[in-house]
Amino acid sequence: MGTSGIEIFAALNDFTDAIVSVPESVCGKFTSLKEIDAQVRDIRQNVIQEIGVVLKNEKNDELSGEERCERLQKTLKEILPYSDSKICLATDAMNNIKSCIDRLDAGFEYVELEIPQQLRLGYPDDRALMNYHSTVTPQTSERRRETRRHQNNQHSQQYSSQERSSSYNNFEDASSPQSSYHTPTKRRKNAVPRKSSSPPLSSTKHAPQSTERRPVRRSESRLKQTNGEPLVKHDTLDSSDISREGEQLYCYCQQVSYGQMIGCDNENCKREWFHLPCVGLVEPPKGIWYCKECEELAKSSESRQ
């Protein structure tokens, strides 16, 4: 027998029932409040009439002024029970809404665990995200390309053949997290897989650690193996790629590093790192991966050739 939707999404159904129960729990209270208001309006009209008679103070009135005041006071006292009833009804309605909110808060975590992230967040609007490309000035792009070329030149001078051999041996033993970062030429030549469905914390470019605020770059990691100092300096980064807190911005969404991210294999990629939900991925793919901009650029270059 197949499993019904109620059994699959039990937490979601309970969450929906809590939302549906909000109008039912307060509708009766509000109806009673309207009925009390109607009764109070009738008494209010009687009070206004009594006040008018007292102010006129007619001599031929059947009741004296004191009797009229006592009668007015008695009428006013009739309103007090209605006021107490309205306070009780409003308090009950507030408590019912509060209990529904507490129920929603308690079940929200289970709903997130029950529904996959891809189904909850959906796929991003690629065209909307691509609008950022039009806001980047040619001068900014040229500065970034110049910075990348400078970094690659420094890296090629510092990374000797002996260090490449040592890094490759350490990568096979999986004993050192620093040995997992190689140049693209070295990785493809030795047929070392660049990505996997469940990569180690520091063994792949496509899975930076979620605890770090900024993904590790290839050139930066490799320089740490040689002299312990990062190659990329903060003063070489463009101001448009820095957040207000001074952190590097990545991806189409122009946010800081968080969660699981994937890196583009194009050395001249403008954004470098991308959040998996922003590119429509659930887990890092195997093999070489390019962002849509770099992929379209490569296709246009091939068509020209």
Swiss-Prot record:
Gene from which the chain derives: png2
Binding site for Zn(2+) 2: C264, C269, C291, C294
Subcellular location: Cytoplasm; Nucleus
Composition skew (Polar residues), residue ranges: 168-183, 195-210
GO MF: methylated histone binding; zinc ion binding
Region ranges (Disordered): 135-239
UniProt keyword annotations, A-Z: Chromatin regulator, Cytoplasm, Metal-binding, Nucleus, Phosphoprotein, Repressor, Transcription, Transcription regulation, Zinc, Zinc-finger
Keyword Phosphoprotein in annotation: yes
Keyword Ribonucleoprotein attributed: no
Pfam families: ING
Protein name stated in the entry: Chromatin modification-related protein png2
Binding site for Zn(2+) 1: C251, C253, H275, C278
Site features described as Histone H3K4me3 binding, chain residue numbers: Y250, M261, D265, W273
Domain remark from Swiss-Prot or TrEMBL: The PHD-type zinc finger mediates the binding to H3K4me3.
Main location: cytoplasm
Modified residues (Phosphoserine): S197, S198
Residue positions, PTM Phosphotyrosine: Y181
GO cellular component: cytosol; NuA4 histone acetyltransferase complex; nucleus; Rpd3L complex; Rpd3L-Expanded complex
Membrane-spanning intervals of the chain: none
Domain of life (superkingdom): Eukaryota
Zinc finger (PHD-type): 248-297
Family in the record: Belongs to the ING family.
Compositionally biased spans, kind Low complexity: 153-167
SUPFAM superfamilies per record: FYVE/PHD zinc finger
Function summary: Component of the clr6 histone deacetylase complex I' responsible for the deacetylation of lysine residues on the N-terminal part of the core histones (H2A, H2B, H3 and H4). Histone deacetylation gives a tag for epigenetic repression and plays an important role in transcriptional regulation, cell cycle progression and developmental events. Has a role in silencing of mating type genes.
Binding partners and assembly: Interacts with H3K4me3 and to a lesser extent with H3K4me2. Component of the clr6 histone deacetylase complex I'composed of at least clr6, png2, prw1, pst1 and sds3.
Cross-referenced InterPro entries: ING_fam, ING_N_histone-binding, Zinc_finger_PHD-type_CS, Znf_FYVE_PHD, Znf_PHD, Znf_PHD-finger, Znf_RING/FYVE/PHD
